[in-house]
């Protein structure tokens, strides 16, 4: 059993190299974002005192389900800034989705909507509680935005859902956004 601090550090590093900088660990992602688990294990072992079993434990126990491990290959489920194709299928969203963010972002969002920035998609939550958890990672006061996903979808916007249940969209135009009740 590895210590929580090391587990968190290794998990964050895995997210970093599998989503943003595979070359930092000497890895090369394929077009779908996959890399050999053996290669990742070797890269992690050169940086941390961590076993194969502990890496698998990190993947399986990650509360955010950030990774998929299959057929001795691993990838991050979403949040990439490197050019990959997650081969996501379009899905019909629930009537409402939510986005947690910092209050300081509201003025820009109110003018321009939600943008994917350096990522492939805007990340949305299926419930307010999850959006609050996401917002809590941001500095300062937080707000929860409600996305009229049903209307967006009916008007031709595409939605996808990642392997770990995060809803994804190319963008969310301002006309589909409202500040959720109960937030500042």
From Swiss-Prot:
Pfam families: PTS_2-RNA. The keyword Lyase does not apply. Removes the 2'-phosphate from RNA via an intermediate in which the phosphate is ADP-ribosylated by NAD followed by a presumed transesterification to release the RNA and generate ADP-ribose 1''-2''-cyclic phosphate (APPR>P). May function as an ADP-ribosylase. GO terms for biological process: tRNA splicing, via endonucleolytic cleavage and ligation. It comes from the Bacteria. This is Probable RNA 2'-phosphotransferase. It is an enzyme of class 2 (transferase). Belongs to the KptA/TPT1 family. Keywords: NAD, Transferase. SUPFAM superfamilies: ADP-ribosylation. Its EC number is 2.7.1.-. It comes from Rhizobium johnstonii (strain DSM 114642 / LMG 32736 / 3841). GO terms for molecular function: NAD+ poly-ADP-ribosyltransferase activity; tRNA 2'-phosphotransferase activity. The gene is kptA. Signal peptide: none annotated.
């Amino acid at each position: 059993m590895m210590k929580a601090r090391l587990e968190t550090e290794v998990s964050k590093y895995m997210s970093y190299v599998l989503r943003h900088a595979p070359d930092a660990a000497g890895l090369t992602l394929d077009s779908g974002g996959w890399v050999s688990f053996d290669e990742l294990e070797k890269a992690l072992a050169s940086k941390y005192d961590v076993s194969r079993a502990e890496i698998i434990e990190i993947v399986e126990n990650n509360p955010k389900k950030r990774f998929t491990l299959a057929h001795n290959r691993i990838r991050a489920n979403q949040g990439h800034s490197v050019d990959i194709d997650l081969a996501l299928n379009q899905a019909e969203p629930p009537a409402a989705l939510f986005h947690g963010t910092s209050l300081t972002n509201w003025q820009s969002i109110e003018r321009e909507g939600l943008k994917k920035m350096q990522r492939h998609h805007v990340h949305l939550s299926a419930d307010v509680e999850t959006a609050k958890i996401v917002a809590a990672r941001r500095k300062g006061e937080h707000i929860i935005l409600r996305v009229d996903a049903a209307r967006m979808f009916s008007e031709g916007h595409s939605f996808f859902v990642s392997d770990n249940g995060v809803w994804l969209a190319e963008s969310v135009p301002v006309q589909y956004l409202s500040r959720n009740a109960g937030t500042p």
